[in-house]
């Protein structure tokens, strides 16, 4: 039976030594740590990229939406020439003139209006330049000129407040297609009829008490009317002055001044963050667009700075970029007075006359990612904003960028650990500003 005996030592159990096990565990931990690190880095990069993509999309839409309205500033029907109107024998040879109002300023009921006239007109007057465009340059403490509460809320750090240090801008232009008019060329203007055609708005939208704006490609007049069916009878609020006749050789159209003369105001507002995962009391900045005095609508979220520079054409043909308070005061950056451009006949005031000379508007937006990301590195927090060094913007056309990024946000109630990027645009004013 000795042939079936196993050799000595073949029955002992085999395995790893304690040192080998410890080495394997250490290698496993290192491998696990590496995998976790890759996942964490990938997650962080994805989070940053997602926020950056959202930031860029918000900025793209904001610049486009503002640009559409700024490009329409001062638009009138069929009379957007590039020079001062001079009455000619034939109306179609005339150039642009500002609409002539046959009602007092208070009766125009212009929404978001902060323009006051030194004297109350007692006769028909041309709408001042600042009725079509007026900006407000704001620091963290005040705005110049002051922004009435009827236009935008007061600056503050709570939800519902206007963002500190952000400009405000109100523009107006004529929109809509109006109605064709059958009228006599005789002056004064006699009762006239509306000729509706396909695509015209319903005549019922012209409400009782609305003012009429009548344009004939050479001039525009604003006056009260009474309506009976399709017949309109012009009136006046200035005794002894009645609307003038129109040129029947041109395409005369009637507009509802209260509805078609559009007022648009832009400002920034702090809104409460509705995200259930957001910290309590977290606020975000939003770009607001207010039309015809109605409730403001949120256009884009994350816009924390809004600044405008206005390129005016001086009497020598040069272009100067000024802030809103400089345009309103009629001075350059050094405080030197700038001559007013020629004013339309019967102009009510020369105050704010440089708004008539605005040819381009330079837009600056600082847009953030809305929600803070604690893991952001210093390089990711760095950004450059043309208006960060002071409350006064420097035009990109006039100065080189700073040597180093500016990384100190304004004290405007928003978080510090946010992605921030500047977006700019230069919008040409296509219509000669009245």
Walk through the language-model features, giving the residues of each:
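N-terminal leader/signal peptides at the extreme start of proteins
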Residues: 1-16
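Aliphatic-rich helix starts adjacent to a transmembrane/signal segment
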Residues: 16-19, 23-67, 71-73, 433-434
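N-terminal pilin/flagellin-like segments and related low-complexity appendage regions
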Residues: 67-364, 370-419, 434
């Amino acid at each position: 039976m000795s042939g079936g005996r196993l050799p000595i030592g073949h029955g002992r159990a085999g395995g790893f030594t304690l040192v080998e096990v410890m080495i394997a565990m250490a290698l496993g931990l290192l491998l696990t740590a590496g995998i976790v690190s890759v996942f964490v880095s990938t997650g962080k990069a994805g989070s940053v990229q997602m926020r950056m993509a959202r930031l860029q999309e918000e900025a793209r839409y904001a610049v486009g939406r503002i640009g559409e309205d700024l490009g329409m500033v001062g638009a009138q029907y069929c009379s957007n020439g590039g020079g001062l109107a001079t009455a000619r024998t034939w109306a179609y040879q005339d150039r642009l003139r500002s609409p002539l109002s046959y009602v007092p300023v208070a009766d125009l009921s212009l929404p978001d209006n902060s323009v006051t006239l030194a004297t109350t007109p007692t006769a028909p007057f041309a709408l001042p330049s600042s009725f079509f465009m007026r900006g407000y340059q704001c620091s963290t403490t005040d705005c110049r000129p002051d922004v009435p509460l009827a236009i935008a809320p007061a600056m503050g750090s709570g939800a519902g407040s206007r963002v500190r240090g952000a400009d405000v801008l109100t523009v107006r232009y004529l929109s809509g297609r109006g109605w064709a008019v059958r009228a006599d060329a005789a002056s004064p203007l006699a009762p006239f009829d509306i000729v509706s055609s396909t695509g015209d708005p319903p005549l019922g939208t012209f409400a009782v008490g609305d003012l009429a704006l009548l344009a004939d490609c050479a001039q525009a007049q604003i006056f009260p009317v009474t309506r009976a069916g399709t017949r309109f009878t012009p009136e006046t609020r200035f005794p002894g002055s009645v609307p003038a006749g129109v040129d029947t050789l041109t395409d005369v159209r009637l507009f509802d001044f209260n509805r078609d003369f559009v007022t648009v105001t832009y400002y920034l507002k702090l809104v409460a963050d509705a995200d259930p995962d957001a910290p309590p009391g977290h606020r975000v900045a939003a770009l607001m667009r207010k039309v015809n005095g109605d409730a403001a609508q949120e256009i884009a979220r994350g816009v924390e700075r809004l600044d405008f520079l206005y390129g005016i054409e001086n009497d020598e043909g040069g272009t100067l970029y000024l802030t809103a308070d400089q345009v309103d005061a009629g001075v350059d950056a050094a405080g030197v007075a700038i001559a007013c451009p020629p004013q339309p006949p019967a102009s009510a005031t020369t105050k704010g006359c440089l708004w008539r000379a605005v040819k381009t508007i330079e837009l600056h937006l600082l847009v953030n990612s809305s929600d803070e990301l604690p893991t952001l590195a210093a390089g990711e927090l760095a950004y450059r904003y043309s208006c960060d060094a002071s409350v006064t913007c420097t035009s990109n056309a006039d100065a080189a960028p700073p040597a180093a990024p500016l990384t100190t946000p304004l004290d405007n109630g928003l978080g510090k650990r946010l992605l921030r990027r500047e977006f700019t645009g230069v919008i040409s004013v296509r219509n000669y500003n009245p």
